[in-house]
Every structure is written in C-alpha cells, then in structure tokens.
Swiss-Prot record:
Entries under InterPro entries matching the protein: Epimerase_deHydtase, NAD(P)-bd_dom_sf, NAD(P)_dehydrat-like
Name used for this protein in its record: Anthocyanidin reductase ((2S)-flavan-3-ol-forming)
Organism per entry: Vitis vinifera (Grape)
Further remarks about this protein from its record: Hyperbolic binding of NADPH and NADP(+) to the free enzyme, with a single binding site each. The most likely enzymatic mechanism is sequential ordered Bi-Uni-Uni-Bi, with NADPH binding first and NADP(+) released last.
Pathway info: Secondary metabolite biosynthesis; flavonoid biosynthesis
Amino acid sequence: MATQHPIGKKTACVVGGTGFVASLLVKLLLQKGYAVNTTVRDPDNQKKVSHLLELQELGDLKIFRADLTDELSFEAPIAGCDFVFHVATPVHFASEDPENDMIKPAIQGVVNVMKACTRAKSVKRVILTSSAAAVTINQLDGTGLVVDEKNWTDIEFLTSAKPPTWGYPASKTLAEKAAWKFAEENNIDLITVIPTLMAGSSLTSDVPSSIGLAMSLITGNEFLINGMKGMQMLSGSVSIAHVEDVCQAHIFVAEKESASGRYICCAANTSVPELAKFLSKRYPQYKVPTDFGDFPPKSKLIISSEKLVKEGFSFKYGIEEIYDESVEYFKAKGLLQN
C-alpha cells in the first residue's frame, strides 16, 4: 500500500497539522528521522497546507484528510504509528455558543482520535496538547501561589460566572478530563503537555493569534492588550513559553519511557505591568505602554514546570530570546517597523 512507511523507522501521527504548534512539531519530528503522518481538514486548501508541502523535502511526511467529528477518518493516518500527537483544538473566541462551537467538538475530537488509537495496535503512547487554561483558573486569593500538575481549572466557576472567552478554558479542561477518563478505561498510555501562552515564530502563512497576543504591548494593539489583561485577571498570571520548547517537550515526553501524567511547559511567569516594563527597556524603539493605573502589578500565581525539568528536560529559550525572535518574526511579516 502507498500509505506504508519504510520498516524500521519510528512513525508519528500529528493530528491537526496546519496549526502553529503542530506544523513545527511535524518539522522537528522529521528532523529527528521520524516518518510522519499528519491530518488536515482540507488538503486542497493551498494556503493552509503550503508549509506542510514544503516540509516534505525534510523527510517522509504524508498528509491525510481527517475531521475531528469523524472517528473513522483517523484510522488510516494512525495505522502503524508508534506515537500519536493530538494537537488540534476548535477555537472560536467570539463564539455566542461555546458549548456547541468549542466544548462538545473538543471532547468529541479527543475521544474520536483515542478510539482510533485503541484500534491501531501499533500505538505505544498518545500525547495530548492541553493548555495552562486547564490548570490555572480558580478563585484563590493572594500572590505567589504556585500551581502545578495537581491543579485543575474550576469548571463550576467558569460555567456559572461565564467570564469573557470562558469557552476556551472550559473546552481545554473538559477535553483533557475526557482524555484521562478514556485512557484509564481503555488502557491507553496517555501523556498531556500543558503549555502556556506561546510565542516565537511560525511556519504557518497566517500569524498565530497567540504570538499576536504576546506581541500586543509592542504593536500597541489595544484589543489584544485588553486580552492580555483579561488573561492575567482570569488565570492569575501572564505565563509564556517558546513554541519550539513546547514542541520539543512533546517529543521528549513521548520518547521518555518513565514519563507519565501531565507536564506543564512554561518558561516564564510575569504580569502585564512587569512584562511592559521589561519590553520597554529591551526595545526602546517601540512605544510600549508602562502606565497601567491601578491594574494589579504582580501576578497572582506561578505556573511551575518543575516536573518536566526534573524529568530531564531543559528549556532552550528564556523570556529575552522568546521576545527577540517574536520581534524579528513580526518585522519579517511586515507587522513591525525596525
């Protein structure tokens, strides 16, 4: 069959290959010598898949049509794979109906992919991309609270108070919980990677919304600056990681036999005022706002990556490198002047 990869090569399936994280994950897996299957909703959409077609020059990459709502569409891409990376998630921040636009599809997507994994006898481990939004949202008070993999976002608070954009954290939390339930019931070796806000550069033709959010203090985008403030107020901090570290963490936990459970991937914890001060000093050529009135200057909590680091992972990028690369990326995209 044409879909078979060469014998002896490790094979990975990356679900949702057109995304920010998934496309870099595909690239890094190919560079490590993996044969890679990736799924996209519409392989005929040239704008969405052009960067994946370019990655085929790096190695053995096959692109499959699959839809998270269609369980059987994952059988072919997952067949014969050692690892399955489920990175795709439905995001509609402006949704009037998060329950049906995000929450149900996210849960259904996770379960459909995992069902396909149970039928493919080759799959050794499933790695699900969760989010810090599934960990950090609670009603605790104070500053300097440390949260780790034991913490879960308070779903009752989200669904009753319905703060702005509540659908996304609710969908990530409930999808991860559904994954753990399915994994336990079906004896699947599952690991979840929990990244914070991600920045750096992207292979995708469109600029990922997370880099836009991270760069908002530099670009002066008021709407996104308010988004950052909202993030700090809801989740307790502005926590950030480089997308490459997040992707390397996915591969690290897949390959590390002793790895188990959840892994937070966070390079730096800060607040909007602290971040603005840092950016204003580092990039004086951009007019970064530094006066935030009575907005809380300190973050409420610290998201700890201690478990991942103790497992043996080391972060390549600190906050300086993350922003240096993001600034260069925005310049290259014509979104920032020199």
